[in-house]
Amino acid sequence: MYEDDRALAFRDINPKAPVHILVIPKKEIANVAEAASADEPLLGHLLTVAATVARQEGIDDTGYRLVINKGPDAGESVPHLHVHLFGGRSLAWPPG
């Protein structure tokens, strides 16, 4: 659904919301704690990609949530940094 030279975005195979998309860097970074200061432009780019995809999915006006999990207690299950984009319904706070 989105790809450029630094990132790609695709639908989650086990969605937790009507819109549940993963935005991932092409660079191998295990998790947010492993990102280096040199990765700051890439991390910002992931957020920009998420906003672009949210507009494409038509959820920009109603709202969406971005999540990065770190560690098992947070629900991290894939050892590659990724941003979850959730939307398409009202999202409760606090989550979980």
Task: Please identify what each model-predicted range represents.
Residues M1-G96:
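HIT superfamily nucleotide-processing domains
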